[in-house]
Amino acid sequence: LHIYVREGSGAKNLETLIKTMLDAGVCLDRCAFCTDDKHVEEIRKEGHISTCIRKAIALGVPVAKAYKMGSYQAAEFYGLKNYGAIGAGYRADIVFLDDLEQVRPLDVMKDGRILTEEDYAKDYSVPVPDELLHTVHVGEVTKEKIRLSCDGKTDVIQMNPHQIVTTHLVEEVPAENGYFKPDGVYNKICVVERHGKTGEIGVAPLKGFGVKGGAVATSVAHDSHNLIVAGDNDEDILAAIKGVEENQGGYVIASGGKVVDVLPLPICGLMS
């Protein structure tokens, strides 16, 4: 059994897991770090696995063990026999640091060569097959298709801060003429099948997202990557859905019945 201690953008579990294992005296030889999705701006600001190592050391993990969890043990778990250590027979992929506990990289060596600014500035773009640029197919989505019958208490999805695990609630939600009427507390969330296969749409009240005066939609939704949208009114929800389809993927913000901002991700609806 290998345990991956996760510390990403949506799910932050490192502090709880490390504290629990240290308190219980658990051997960390079968543990490694992972992020399981970390936003690029966070990677640029604070680092990637380096952040996990830094936090683990601050929580009391011995320095050498923290680095082993962030390198050798991870490579070992994945069967990457030539990675994760400095020695004969290992790839010369090395990070040079100025401080062990702060984990601040000074230089990076790849295959025995120190990388330069020119290496980072290279254009690594490649041709994109046309079929990968047309993957968002939702068809016509109307108000009728995103209605949710509601009379009294109903099932609600509760978001939890810094977690990807949600909580199932049964609560009284706002309704009008027998249908759920979203607001700033109880947003409406819709999952729209976007691969042109079934056209199915799932709808539910969402608590804890707190969008007011608009809607947010995205085609990045692990693991099936259907279109997910949440908002406090149907007009903006529909506008956001349409915006994602028109851009063939990405993140869309809608307000006042129209798209007000968009980050296009046209390659498979996932990448720029």
Regions found by a protein language model. Give the residues of each.
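Active-site microenvironment of metallo-dependent hydrolases
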Residues: 44-60, 64-272
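Histidine/acidic residue-rich metal-binding segments in metalloenzymes
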Residues: 1-5, 10-33, 42-58, 62-65, ...
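Active-site glycine-centered loops adjacent to acidic/histidine catalytic or metal-binding residues
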Residues: 36
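Short, glycine/acidic-enriched loop or turn micro-motifs at the edges of active sites
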Residues: 39
